Amino acid sequence: MYMWRERSKEEKHEDVVNTGLLPLDVVEGFKIRPGFFRMYGACVASNGVSFTINSHGATRCTLLLFKPQASKPYARIPFPDSYRIGDTYSMLVFDIKPDEFEYAFSFDGPYEPAKGLLFNEENVLLDPYSRAVTGQRKWGEKPEVGKDFEYRARVVKSNFDWGNIKQLEQPFEDLVIYETHVRGYTKDKSSGVSAPGTFAGLKDKIPYLKDLGINAVELMPIFEFDEMESARVVDGVQLYNYWGYNTVSFFAPNTSYAFNEEHNHEGDELKSLIKALKENGIEVIIDVVFNHTAEGNEMGPCFSFKGIDNNVYYMLTPDAHYYNFSGCGNVMNCNHPVVRSFIIDCLRHWAIEYRVDGFRFDLASILGRDQNGAPMANPPILESLAFDPVLGKMKLIAEAWDAGGLYQVGSFPSWNRWAEWNGRYRDDMRSFLKGDDGMAGNAITRITGSRDLYSPESRGHKASVNFMTCHDGFTLYDLYSYNEKHNEKNGWNNTDGDNNGHSWNCGAEGETDDPNVNGLRRRLIKNAFAALLCSRGPAMFFAGDEFCNTQFGNNNAYCQDNIISWLDWSRLEEFKEIHDFVRHMIQFRKEHPILRKMTKPSSCQFPEISVHNGTPFNASTDYKTKLIGIMYAGRNEEDTEDDIVFYCMNAYWEPLVMQLPVLPNGKHWHVDTNTNAEYFDGEDFTAKTELLGVNTIRVPARTTIILVAE
């Protein structure tokens, strides 16, 4: 870590601590003195570099210095006993230049696996606070030197000029979040970018995102991870740790996502992307994985936390084995005071150094477990993040479950700060939209804000992040193209991935030339987007859904660094109708604040939200109900007139009739959107709507119609 302050444009933007300190000791030929104890990691000073790290169980710590790419250290500098205060070691080494070395640590101490103690001074250990990691500069290539799991840190001096960029602080409920994978978004040649698969490549797509109406991107893991971890070949195809949910270094951006291979440039390339996104009104939320690390279980490597303080950083069973609530071999001990401080430091680093706007916490329920794995009512780490002064305006989004069976959707400890991926929304809406019986009432509840899970009085309209799709599961196109998952190419005999995705192939498994099947699929995709963007709460969808990207039925593409996971941008032309519909619905959502939040009451005194299942103000449903109507009534953004929207969805396989509420004051219903309308390039989506009277409408089979009062 390092100290940061806002500097004028006239100053150099370099993270250097100016000091007139003089050496006090000489060890192994290096001039040294005690370092900056409150600044963990490597901190550049005007006359050297300070190195600070902590370990409770170690008896000795040694700093290892390497020439870039060298296999052996050129210097081993033990920390003098007087350079340790409590559990923290800190040493300022004079006259070393950041660009000319890489570093690591070794720790000596008891090696007693039965007690969870794994100290071994032969282990080369990565600094947990390292801001850059050496090694896999190019995707898919192992380092030529060192052991498979030997990572080293690089010292970073930043001179990036942010200008006047700051957090955008858009209201949470106004967000349309676009989840994407940095590499997969532009890696395919169809993306047309100059630097495919990189931060720079994603930057080239910002005009596209802005035109679509996106105001927040959620980046799948961008922390340093090892794509070669568990790499294997299946049927002649190289598989990788493609998604990146196996963190190596929490403070460092992933080096292989940088196009520019110059020393320490990955950070600036990421900053340039974030700055450009913000300049275009797009917030940046990053996916963080504090539930486990890439060190795995007892059979996994020891390259950092295990060798520094194994029984501090990880949850261990009474016989010193690793708990596995993550499903990935180990679990971080998030509510231990040391680990809690580490997590807070990390998130502050990304907020300050990279100016991100929020975080999505993978398997966040693990952060709510105590050191023995039991769920806590008020987990200290979650409370600390909710009230941290640096993170006070950050969006905090929880994936409110874990692989150990703890499911907290609607009950995640929030302090009115945390939002949640609403998995109930996904499941209930998928079931209703494909026509399952008994789901109408659930669908109404989900669309209107999931009040059974998130009280608007206590948690507002921001707690439920609504989504139909994410990286985990079918794409939206595949949701309506496959009844079964097709994960054979993952190499596990199709046993991996979710077996209950609530999908429906519309009559043919996979691709088909049947125009009726393809027409129905397109209509269901539009129905899904219409429901999502007319629902209370932030909306999120997976990148490529807006032009029907496919993973060919694979609903667990975590290892597929190929056309299965890469977006095929040629489909943008083929499915322009869907793209234009999504853009239309995002704009419609922006134009009608009543869809997103409570406004002032309408002058006509309609209730803010009312249900009309076939007839006005009929909120009753039964097992066979397939036609639902929801009316939102309030005031427009300027408070100059009423804002009244009627959402109508027929999930039945035959047309049904909807009677609309009578409008006062000379207003009339006008159709804005009809998912059954024939599409003509450049036209709207209102054609072929059959009005049977002033306040009666015929809703075609499996169709959404949206009306506004004018």
What are these regions (language model features)?
Residues 103, 107-164, 227-247, 252, ...:
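Core domains of carbohydrate- and sulfate-ester-processing enzymes
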Residues 176-178, 217, 284-286, 359, ...:
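Hydrophobic faces of well-ordered beta-strands that scaffold small-molecule active sites
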Residues 201-204, 217-218, 265-272, 284, ...:
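Generic recognition of stable, solvent-exposed alpha-helical segments in well-folded globular domains
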Residues 100, 112-116, 186-188, 225-229, ...:
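Short catalytic/ligand-binding loop motif for oxyanion handling, primarily in non-cytosolic enzymes
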Residues 130-134, 355, 368-372, 377-543, ...:
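Conserved alpha/beta catalytic core and glycan-binding cleft of carbohydrate-active enzymes
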Residues 181-356, 363-390, 406, 453:
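Substrate-binding/active-site clefts of carbohydrate-active enzymes
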